């Protein structure tokens, strides 16, 4: 997809809430990716990120180990950002479903 962000100073505006949320996700991914470079997480690093940063959306009893094992392409026990994004998408779906049930 590439980078589409404007490099022009006059185009620089305050980021929207969604843009800030995406930047926060990326920063958190990089903060937890210690072993083997900033572009991947080990299953252990992903587990730490999820348990520390998403304790209410993905509590420890939500089958986290199985979800991690089933994520994307787990080559050499390294998970790329896309796999993390899959997990975030799953968490977002559960919030949407929960809100829909509560709204009924």
UniProtKB/Swiss-Prot annotation:
Domain EF-hand positions: 27-61
Protein name as it appears in the record: Protein S100-A14
Cytoplasm listed as a keyword: yes
Gene3D superfamilies: EF-hand
Gene Ontology biological-process annotations: apoptotic process; defense response to bacterium; positive regulation of granulocyte chemotaxis; positive regulation of monocyte chemotaxis; response to lipopolysaccharide; toll-like receptor 4 signaling pathway
Disulfide bonds: none
Keywords from the named record: Apoptosis, Cytoplasm
A Pfam family that the UniProt record links to this protein: S_100
Naturally occurring in which organism (per UniProt): Bos taurus (Bovine)
UniProt gene name: S100A14
Cell location: Cytoplasm
An annotated GO cellular component: perinuclear region of cytoplasm
Subunit details: Homodimer. Interacts with AGER.
Molecular function via GO: calcium ion binding; calcium-dependent protein binding; chemokine receptor binding
PANTHER family the UniProt entry points to: PROTEIN S100-A14, S100 CALCIUM-BINDING PROTEIN
Role: Modulates P53/TP53 protein levels, and thereby plays a role in the regulation of cell survival and apoptosis. Depending on the context, it can promote cell proliferation or apoptosis. Plays a role in the regulation of cell migration by modulating the levels of MMP2, a matrix protease that is under transcriptional control of P53/TP53. Does not bind calcium.
